[in-house]
Amino acid sequence: MSIFIPKARRPTFELHLRIHDVVNIPLITGVIFVKWNIEGIHSRHANDQTEAEPVLEHRVTWEYETCVSVRMIIDNDNLLKDKFLILQVLCDSHTDSGVIRLGILKINLTEYVYVGQDTRKYLLADSKINATIRIGISLKQTSGNKDFRVSKTLGKPQVFSGLTGLLTDGKELKRRDDEVYTSTGLASAWAEKMLHSIKDFNQKTTVFHMHTRNNKYDTREIVDDIFFGGTGWAEPPKIADIVDAAGDTDLISLEIRQKSWVLPSEKVLNKRLP
């Protein structure tokens, strides 16, 4: 039990949590709220929820902010044990179905120990939709031993791992779209719009042939940079440096996969064909 662990091996951190918004919600009515808790901590300060806000243009905004104290444990190998923040995105449509869970997000707080403040979008897990939640987290140690290791540091934004994953194989997006399409028809128009956007984005990335001798970005980094408003170039390009990307296996692979994706409207058309 943690009560028998020396105080020096139970460092305390001040967690600042900001919940900004959830976007790409395939609903036109209803209210959305987010419940959060810190796994393994049952005190009142370690769980709360945002206000329930209405869906407007497939988005809900809160700008919710809170600050809590979190105690972690350093094990015998001098490793800071994982401590998870869990967020559930819930929807109340004011119907007989009651409150339903749109998705969940599980974040390992130990990854934020050496990061400071960070704000990013995450693709919801355990979900049939492609909604993303934008949150901000900062973690500051206030007491205890600071001589410890962490098992994993914070990597690239998960939402972008999710997006490039969609561009790489498309399996998760197709699975979610299939489930939406074969259910009650909820948000099929939204799902098709989302797929059109992804296919168009992938096609543009392929056509641009953004490989150059002076570009330090690989294909994945090019997509990441364009998604966040960049040009896809590590440095301003020179026309003379642009090379023919016809033999680029990564871009060819993207093009093949892009052609293999099927939109809901295309499914209907195929069913109608003799």
Curated annotation (Swiss-Prot):
What is an example of a GO molecular function annotated in this UniProt entry? Answer: lipid binding
- InterPro entries registered for this protein in UniProt: EEIG1/2-like, NT-C2
Start and end of every C2 NT-type domain?
3-141
Q: Its GO CC terms?
A: cell cortex
- Family to which this protein belongs: To yeast YBL086c.
User: What is this protein identified as?
Assistant: Uncharacterized protein C1494.08c
